[in-house]
Swiss-Prot record:
A motif (BH1) lies at residues 113-132. One of its GO terms (biological process) is release of cytochrome c from mitochondria. One of its GO terms (molecular function) is channel activity. This is Bcl-2-related ovarian killer protein. The lineage of its organism: Eukaryota, Metazoa, Chordata, Craniata, Vertebrata.
Length: 213
C-alpha cells in the first residue's frame, strides 16, 4: 500500500538527523516512519499484507533501521507477555472500523491513558503495539486506508505528548539502551513499566465504551 511506501520519500532525511539534535518535526517524522515499519512487520506476520513489497522499495537504513529493529524486538517481548492485549483491538474497544473519527478517537484515548502516569520506553513500545494491532484489524476488515489514519494519529500524539521527553534523551536512538545495557535493572525497567500500562489500557477501553451523556 502507498501509505507504507511513503516512508521512502524522507528516509534519508530521517536517518541523517540521528547525527545531531533532532527538531520536533524530525522526531515526529521518525515516529511515523517507525510506525509504518512496525505496522508492516505485524501485517506480514499476521498474513494480512494486502500487497507484496516491491523489490525497488527502499527500506530504512543506518541508525533508523537499528532503532526500528530494536522497537520490533521489544514489541515481540511485550506481545509475548500479554498477547491478548495487543490482538483484536477493535473488538476489545467495541468500535466500528468504518469511521475515521471513531478510530482516531479510540486510538488517542488509549494512547492518553497509557501515558497517564508518565513516560517510559516500555509505554512507547506499548503504544506502537496498540497501533499495529489496530492496523491489522483495519486491514482484516477491508479498511486498509485506516492505516494512514493510525500512523498520522500516532505522529500527532508524539508531537503533543512525547517530543519534549524524546528531545531530553537525544531522540529515538536512546531506545537502544534498553537492549545494550549490561545493567539488568534497566532492561527489566521497561518491561515493568509496560506491564503497568496494561491497567491504563484496560481503563481506556472502559472510557471508550462509556455511553455519551
Amino acid at each position: 500500500m502507498e501509505v507504507l511506501r511513503r516512508s521512502s520519500v524522507f528516509a534519508a532525511e530521517v536517518m541523517e538527523v540521528f547525527d545531531r539534535s533532532p527538531t520536533d518535526k524530525e522526531l515526529v517524522s521518525q515516529a511515523k516512519a517507525l510506525c509504518r515499519d512496525y505496522i508492516n512487520s505485524r501485517l506480514i506476520r499476521a498474513g494480512v499484507s494486502w500487497s507484496k513489497p516491491e523489490h525497488n522499495t527502499p527500506v530504512p537504513g543506518g541508525k533508523l533501521a537499528e532503532v526500528s529493529a530494536i522497537l520490533l524486538r521489544l514489541g515481540d517481548e511485550l506481545e509475548y507477555i500479554r498477547p491478548n492485549v495487543y490482538r483484536n483491538i477493535a473488538r476489545q474497544l467495541n468500535i466500528s472500523l468504518h469511521s475515521e473519527t471513531v478510530v482516531t478517537d479510540a486510538f488517542l484515548a488509549v494512547a492518553a491513558q497509557i501515558f497517564t502516569a508518565g513516560i517510559t520506553w516500555g509505554k512507547v513500545v506499548s503504544l506502537y503495539a496498540v497501533a499495529a494491532g489496530l492496523a491489522v484489524d483495519c486491514v482484516r476488515h477491508a479498511q486498509p486506508a485506516m492505516v494512514h489514519t493510525i500512523v498520522d494519529c500516532l505522529g500527532e500524539f508524539v508531537r503533543k505528548t512525547l517530543v519534549t521527553w524524546l528531545k531530553r534523551r537525544g531522540g529515538w536512538a536512546d531506545i537502544t539502551k534498553c537492549v545494550v545495557s549490561t545493567d539488568p535493572s534497566l532492561r527489566s525497567h521497561w518491561l515493568v513499566a509496560a506491564v503497568c500500562s496494561f491497567g491504563h489500557f484496560l481503563k481506556a477501553i472502559f472510557f471508550v465504551l462509556l455511553p455519551e451523556r
